[in-house]
Amino acid sequence: MKPAAIVILAIAITVMTTSAEQARPAPKPSILVHLTSGPENPTKAALAFLVARTAIEQGHTVSMFLAGDAVQLLRDSTLDNLAGLGTGKLREHYDIIVKGGGKFYLSGMSSNARGISAAELQGKPAELAPPAILLKLALENERMFTY
């Protein structure tokens, strides 16, 4: 092959590679939603789930860390009955978060104090977690919302 042909081939490969890299969208930031409001504040609780749902719908990876009274939100009776004023129904938000691959972490200490066990979380993408997991998630995720 002649030197000029080699140069042209090298340029063509570079242009094709650069075009393919530019066509690939940048990954969306991962998001952590930290919620401490529970059924006593349905609007704020549903708002946190609405934000997580919206992030899932926009293609973000989402984790939720529920602490304090918020751990009660994953009880089926609460999921089925809680609705915020202008922020929607908790069950609808939860189902979309789950379908989109969202993960829930519940403070183990808060859950224990409110009678929520790992058995009650069976079948849900949720686990009991210590404060060290909250810190780990806060450092790993690119954005964090707190309610």
What is the predicted function of each stretch?
Residues K44-L82:
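N-terminal, post-signal-peptide region of Sec/Tat-exported proteins
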